[in-house]
């Protein structure tokens, strides 16, 4: 398990954009992490005040950060940055609301030089909330 302090060492993101709370499992090419979604998230102030729903783009950002933790925790990538290069086949299946625990899985499926492709999914209570293929560039 990777705690929040180690996540902050790997990722440059900070409040309010740090969207990974804890890593539950990690292997060479796959990671499972969680985000506790609370009513105090700043994005709920405007999305939507009477019916708070986590924006889909932030779910995808949380998945990207999950993959980033895996890649940036590797010795050869310490001190580097991971840049979002694209998203494909993104689908949103379930609303994510305050009180949900978002379980995020990212699996690297292809690497070529500094480019990596990840299959990612986010689930709440075992039900698919979002999924997609993410492309990253690893840079200085």
Curated annotation (Swiss-Prot):
Entry's Gene Ontology molecular function annotations: (3R)-hydroxyacyl-[acyl-carrier-protein] dehydratase activity
The protein's Enzyme Commission number: 4.2.1.59
Pfam families hit by this protein: FabA (PF07977)
Catalytic reaction(s) noted: a (3R)-hydroxyacyl-[ACP] = a (2E)-enoyl-[ACP] + H2O
Keywords: Cytoplasm, Lipid A biosynthesis, Lipid biosynthesis, Lipid metabolism, Lyase
Active site: 47
InterPro entries documented for this protein: FabA_FabZ, FabZ, HotDog_dom_sf
Compartment(s): Cytoplasm
Gene3D superfamilies: Hotdog Thioesterase
Biological process (GO), any one: lipid A biosynthetic process
Top enzyme category: lyase
GO cellular component: cytoplasm; membrane
Stored NCBIfam families: fabZ, PRK00006.1
Function: Involved in unsaturated fatty acids biosynthesis. Catalyzes the dehydration of short chain beta-hydroxyacyl-ACPs and long chain saturated and unsaturated beta-hydroxyacyl-ACPs.
Protein family (similarity comment): Belongs to the thioester dehydratase family. FabZ subfamily.
Protein name listed in UniProt: 3-hydroxyacyl-[acyl-carrier-protein] dehydratase FabZ
Native source species: Streptococcus sanguinis (strain SK36)
Gene name for this UniProt entry: fabZ
């Amino acid at each position: 398990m990777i705690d929040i302090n180690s996540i902050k060492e790997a990722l440059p993101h900070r409040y309010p954009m740090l969207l990974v709370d804890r890593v539950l499992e990690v292997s060479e090419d796959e990671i499972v992490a969680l985000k506790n979604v609370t009513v105090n998230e700043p994005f709920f102030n405007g999305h939507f005040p009477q019916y708070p729903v986590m924006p889909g783009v932030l779910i995808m950002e949380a998945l990207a950060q999950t993959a980033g933790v895996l890649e940036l925790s590797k010795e050869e990538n310490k001190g580097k940055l991971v840049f979002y290069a694209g998203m494909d086949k993104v689908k949103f299946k379930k609303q994510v609301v305050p009180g949900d625990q978002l379980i995020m899985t990212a699996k690297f499926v292809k690497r070529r030089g500094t480019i990596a492709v990840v299959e990612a999914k986010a689930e709440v209570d075992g039900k698919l909330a979002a999924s997609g293929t993410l492309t990253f560039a690893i840079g200085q």
